[in-house]
Amino acid sequence: MIYYVAMPFIPKDDGLTPGQGAECPSEIAAIRRAEAMSRHEPNVGAIAFSRTGDPNVGEFEDAVILKAFGVVPDDFGYG
């Protein structure tokens, strides 16, 4: 099963912290949602990513960054 997620980033004193992620029905929906999140204060950026896995056994592959908007942490590098 593939999950698509949009997740914003919020500035904190010690850097950026992830905000509340939103599961989306498709890759395009996740990208559009991330773009919208990146423009909504207090967010300074957002990413859209996908993750493949089996929730019944709790096994998931690493996330694949689909698109990044605005400011995101270096460890969420895109491109």
PLM region spans:
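Short aromatic-glycine-(Arg/Gly/Cys) micro-motifs in beta-strand/loop hairpins
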Residues: M1-G19
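A generic short-segment signal for beta-strand/edge and adjacent turn/coil regions
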Residues: D14-Q20, R32-M37, D74
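Short, mixed-charge low-complexity intrinsically disordered segments
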Residues: S38-G79
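A short, charged, amphipathic alpha-helix used as a generic interaction element across diverse proteins
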Residues: C24-G45
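Unusually extended, aromatic-enriched hydrophobic runs near protein termini
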Residues: M1-Y4, S26-E27, V44, Y78
